[in-house]
Curated annotation (Swiss-Prot):
ATP binds at residues 10-17. It comes from Staphylothermus marinus (strain ATCC 43588 / DSM 3639 / JCM 9404 / F1). Belongs to the UPF0200 family. Keywords: ATP-binding, Nucleotide-binding. PANTHER family: DEPHOSPHO-COA KINASE (PTHR41930:SF1), UPF0200 PROTEIN MJ1399 (PTHR41930). GO terms for molecular function: ATP binding. Gene3D superfamilies: P-loop containing nucleotide triphosphate hydrolases (3.40.50.300). HAMAP family: UPF0200 (MF_01111). This is UPF0200 protein Smar_1234.
Length: 189
C-alpha cells in the first residue's frame, strides 16, 4: 500500500485539531508540524511564548530553508503506508516537499478572525496569543509564510463557523472518502 498524505491547513484557531480528532477516530496517524516548531522553540529559548514561536519559525526557515519543517516531518513519516494526516502545512514550498514524497491532497479549515480569536483564548495552548494585537501579528506571520496560498489551493474546504459537531462530521466524511478512495486505488493497482 502506498503512502497518501492529507495535508491540513488553516489559520490558528480555525479548527485543524477537529480534523486531527476525526482522523484518529478513523485510525489514521496524525503528525503536527507545529510540534517541530514548539520543540525547537523550547530548545532554543526554554520558554514558549507567541514571540519565541514567531522568532523560531522565522529563524529555522532562514537558517535551514523554507522547507525545513516539512523535511523534519517527512523524517517522522518515511516508513508509513496508507493514509496519514499532516496537520499544519503553511506554505506551497512545504506542499511541494510532500508532493515529491507521496500523493497528497490539501484539506483546509476556515473560520473568521473573531471566531478564531475566541477559540484561541479558550484553549490556552503554550505560544498562543492572549490579546488581539498578538493574534493579528501571528496571523500576519502565518500569511507571510504563504498559508493563504495553501488555503486558496485546497482540494477540500471545511468552513468552521458552526458547532464542533458540524465541523467534525464534515472532516470525518471527507477523510472517510479519502480512505475509501485510497483503498480502492491500491486494490486496482
Amino acid at each position: 500500500m502506498k503512502l497518501f498524505i492529507v495535508l491540513v491547513a488553516g489559520m490558528p484557531g480555525a479548527g485543524k485539531s477537529i480534523v486531527s480528532k476525526a482522523a484518529r477516530d478513523l485510525g489514521l496517524p496524525v503528525y503536527n508540524m507545529g510540534d517541530v516548531i514548539r520543540m525547537e522553540t523550547s530548545r532554543l529559548y526554554g520558554i514558549i511564548t507567541p514571540e519565541t514561536m514567531r522568532e523560531t519559525s522565522r529563524r529555522v526557515r532562514k537558517l535551514y530553508g523554507e522547507d525545513y519543517v516539512a523535511r523534519k516531518t517527512i523524517e517522522q513519516i518515511k516508513e508509513k503506508r496508507g493514509v496519514i494526516v499532516v496537520d499544519g502545512v503553511r506554505s506551497l514550498v512545504e506542499v511541494e516537499v510532500f508532493k515529491k514524497y507521496a500523493e497528497t491532497v490539501i484539506l483546509a479549515v476556515h473560520a473568521s478572525p473573531k471566531t478564531r480569536f475566541e477559540r484561541i483564548r479558550k484553549r490556552n495552548r503554550p505560544g498562543d496569543p492572549d490579546n488581539w494585537e498578538d493574534f493579528v501579528k501571528r496571523d500576519l506571520t502565518e500569511l507571510q509564510f504563504g498559508l493563504g496560498n495553501v488555503i486558496a489551493l485546497a482540494d477540500y474546504m471545511i468552513v468552521n463557523e458552526g458547532s464542533i459537531e458540524e465541523a467534525y462530521r464534515g472532516a470525518y466524511n471527507i477523510l472517510k472518502k479519502l480512505v475509501e478512495k485510497n483503498a480502492k486505488d491500491n486494490s486496482d493497482s
